[in-house]
Amino acid sequence: MPRRRVAAKREILDDPKYGSQILAKFMNHVMESGKKAVAERIVYGALDTVKSRKNSDPLEIFEKALDAIAPLVEVKSRRVGGATYQVPVEVRPSRRNALAMRWLVDSARKRGEKSMALRLAGELLDASEGKGAAVKKREDVHRMAEANKAFSHYRF
């Protein structure tokens, strides 16, 4: 156990355009080298593209995409005797969102469209429909947890 006090969670301000705290957190995941204005331009550009393609609320599509990506279980390595087992554990809600955002940004960066805003929009639309690289990542993690269900009695 750590000897110091646990750091307090910082309060994140809502984003100015949509008034959503989860979108503000997502912008922080998109941001590189502290360039928040660039990250905002990318995210708002992606949401505008989503709005023009789907003619519906882009924030709803964003939240639907995050739900489709967020994992329910993951595996953690646990050493027992001389062997290391991959033990399936449930994911806490805050980590679920963080992983979903990270996977969404990573898979958007690997796409082939011209700008990051278009890549992100494409990945958001794919994820909201239950397909795309980020959803595949979630399914891989779930499959790994299912395969190692036999070791679930090694709790943390």
From Swiss-Prot:
GO terms for biological process: translation. The keyword Ribosomal protein applies. One of its GO terms (cellular component) is small ribosomal subunit. Keywords: Ribonucleoprotein, Ribosomal protein, RNA-binding, rRNA-binding, tRNA-binding. The keyword Hydrolase does not apply. One of its GO terms (molecular function) is structural constituent of ribosome. Part of the 30S ribosomal subunit. Contacts proteins S9 and S11. HAMAP family: Ribosomal_uS7_B. Belongs to the universal ribosomal protein uS7 family. One of the primary rRNA binding proteins, it binds directly to 16S rRNA where it nucleates assembly of the head domain of the 30S subunit. Is located at the subunit interface close to the decoding center, probably blocks exit of the E-site tRNA. This is Small ribosomal subunit protein uS7. The lineage of its organism: Bacteria, Pseudomonadati, Pseudomonadota, Gammaproteobacteria, Pseudomonadales. The gene is rpsG.
